[in-house]
Amino acid sequence: GFNPCGETCWNKPTCHAPGCTCSIANICVRN
């Protein structure tokens, strides 16, 4: 399925998509 938080966050502390947060695996997931 479509993941609106599909960006990764290895090199940046935040996710750009609204309602998303950086998971422990350095992937943006729904907050």
From Swiss-Prot:
Q: What does this protein do?
A: Probably participates in a plant defense mechanism.
Q: Which UniProt keywords apply?
A: Disulfide bond, Knottin, Plant defense
Residues involved in crosslink (Cyclopeptide (Gly-Asn))?
G1-N31
Q: What is known of its domains?
A: The presence of a 'disulfide through disulfide knot' structurally defines this protein as a knottin.
Concerning PTM, the database record says: This is a cyclic peptide.
**Any Pfam family:** Cyclotide
Official protein name in the record? Cyclotide psybry B
Q: Which GO BP terms, alphabetically?
A: defense response
Under the heading InterPro entries, the entry gives: Cyclotide, Cyclotide_sf
> Its family?
Belongs to the cyclotide family.
Q: List the disulfide bonds.
A: C5-C20, C9-C22, C15-C28
Origin species, per record, is Psychotria brachyceras
